[in-house]
Amino acid sequence: FQFNPQTLPETHYLVTEHGNARKAKRWPLNTVFVSKNHASRYGSDQYVLNGLDWESYGAVDLDNIRTRFHFLGKAAWSVKNVSGAIRVAKKAGVELDVLGGNRINFRRGFRWTLSRSIHFHGMVGGSEKTGLLNASRGMIFPVRWHEPFGLAVIESLYFGCPVFSTPYGSLPELVPETCGFLSASASEMAEAVRTNRFDPRACHAHVKQHFSVETMTRNYLTMYQRVLDGETLNAQPPVIQDPARNLPWHA
């Protein structure tokens, strides 16, 4: 992951870059990225959107009575902006499940909030994770960086959860107007959360159509064939153009 080989192999190769480089460095010519925006920030137009094996996620209950919203991500990363998600939930007057972070840090004490309307679940997976997503009204995800892709976003959409996020990185590619709301304003996002006019079935259908493991595999096979045919995917070595972090967030 994020390994940049110093000596290129003699055989045909393809490198997938999944993250945001902190410093400008040259990537191999046959590098692909995980969203159109991600590629463009490296001066490339070569990308394959991620996809997941939805059959492995178990049953989705789109008729379930849903009461809370959720945040899903590495809450300890400041760019994921869990504090912003908590602010939005409080402004909207809704309860929030935080998946991927704990309320207590033994070096820092209580983190983010003591509110009883905010529920921390730590790192979750399996049936615990899918159970929480099946009970969620939507995902609040106000990231402050250019998200390269966002597996948590498509996981949430699969379970019928509209996504309320910032318009950075890949988010406009993943979340159409029928499946969520994008804004860098906490007040605007909170109002969208309050009204929540989105259809869970539309969210579920969107990701099944566009972000399946089968679609991703076909697109990678096309890339592999181009390389095997002697094509060089990028004319110049990709180099990150915009390593921006802490993008605007109006609390």
Predicted regions and their residues:
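A short hydrophobic beta-strand element within the catalytic core of glycosyltransferases
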Residues: 139-141
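Nucleotide-sugar-dependent
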Residues: 76-80, 144-151, 172-173
